Design a protein with these regions (language model features):
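N-terminal pre-domain/capping segments
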Residues: 1-112, 270, 274-295
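Hydrophobic faces of well-ordered beta-strands that scaffold small-molecule active sites
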Residues: 5-13, 46-48, 73-78, 119-121, ...
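Active-site beta-loop-alpha junctions enriched in small/polar residues
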Residues: 10-16, 49-51, 78-82, 124-126, ...
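Gly/Pro-rich active-site loop or hairpin
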Residues: 19-28, 86, 90-97, 170, ...
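A structural motif
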Residues: 40-43, 113-116, 215, 248-249
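Glycine-enriched alpha-helix->loop->beta-strand junction motifs that scaffold or abut catalytic
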Residues: 42, 184-189, 210-216
Length: 295
């Protein structure tokens, strides 16, 4: 059964195990096997946020598999895992800016090779500073400069607000919008993750409206538990339909665990995704004039 929207299946996003989304169904952790499986399911792409941690041989194999299957690549986290909670985005010293640019150029080269649309930016605060407003101004300045760097590679930057990691400086949509607006450079936007936003902002539709033109990437998970759409309590059909109606045409990352991580649970979860997709399709069709049920 084909899917109507541009979903991605992930190759592993949660440390320390980085379990691929369909591990039980595929039976291996080999990225190319998962890319072929995602294509067979009718997915539009794959999501490999920690691709920077892979070696060149594996990245080349992933690139060839994407070309062979016609799948797209989602966003990559812009720095290696060990630097995600370091205050690199608040550092405006000459050495700090030079180090940041080196990291971003390396990530952009990898993203360009895989066809990724954007680098995900997680912004940590500097624990040795108390000037939160100035730190956010420094982040905006660095985003402005690095956005111009990634533009040379045809790639954007996308800030992902959250509190799931320690010491985050940009924790919700309001804070992310303020910094991205201050950066004021094309190609720098916001990742809207329904799991994070439901925790930090509450009202998904209000947060989506607040994100507005800054929406770069959409990640769909249900809550509680970061499970597949339809396995939780969030009004995800309305959310995705609203994003599509507003003109969003990018990939939709399914960055979730399963309600049941067994092989049968993956199959049941995939059925939930297909039902969710059908409801979204009905909600965005012009002839559909009545609200759709959520689950």
């Amino acid at each position: 059964m084909s899917l109507t929207q541009r979903y991605t299946a992930h190759l592993g996003y949660a440390p320390p195990k980085f379990r691929p989304q369909f591990l039980e169904s595929v039976g291996t952790t080999t990225p190319t096997d998962h890319i072929e499986y995602a294509a067979a399911l009718g997915m539009a792409g794959i999501f490999d946020p920690w691709a920077l941690g892979r070696d060149r041989r594996e990245l080349d194999e992933i690139g060839r598999a994407l070309t062979d299957t016609g799948l797209s690549c989602g966003s990559l986290v812009c720095v290696p895992l060990d630097k995600v909670t370091a205050p690199i985005w608040t550092d405006r010293t000459a050495s700090g800016r030079h180090s940041l640019e080196q990291l971003i150029r390396a990530a952009a080269e990898t993203g360009q090779a895989l066809g990724s649309p954007a680098l995900a930016v997680l912004v940590a605060a500097d624990p040795d500073r108390t000037d939160i407003a100035q730190q956010r101004a420094d982040v905006a300045a660095n985003l402005r400069e690095m956005g111009r760097v990634t533009a040379d590679f045809g790639i954007g930057l996308a800030v992902e607000p959250m509190i799931a990691l320690p010491n985050m400086l940009l924790r919700n949509i309001t804070e992310a919008v303020a910094v991205v607006s201050a950066a004021d450079v094309p190609g720098v936007g916001i990742i809207f993750d329904t799991g994070h936003v439901s925790t930090t902002d509450g009202d998904l539709l209000a947060a989506l409206r607040a994100t507005g033109e800054h929406l770069s990437l959409l990640q769909i998970v249900d809550m509680p538990g970061r499970v597949e759409p339809g396995a939780g309590e969030l009004q995800l059909v309305d959310l995705l339909a609203a994003a599509l109606d507003s003109g969003y045409a990018g990939l939709i990352d399914l960055e979730h665990y399963w309600a049941d991580a067994s092989r049968d649970g993956e199959r049941a979860g995939l059925d939930r995704i297909r039902r969710f997709d059908a409801l979204v399709d009905a909600a965005v069709r012009p002839q559909s004039a009545t609200p759709s049920p959520q689950h």
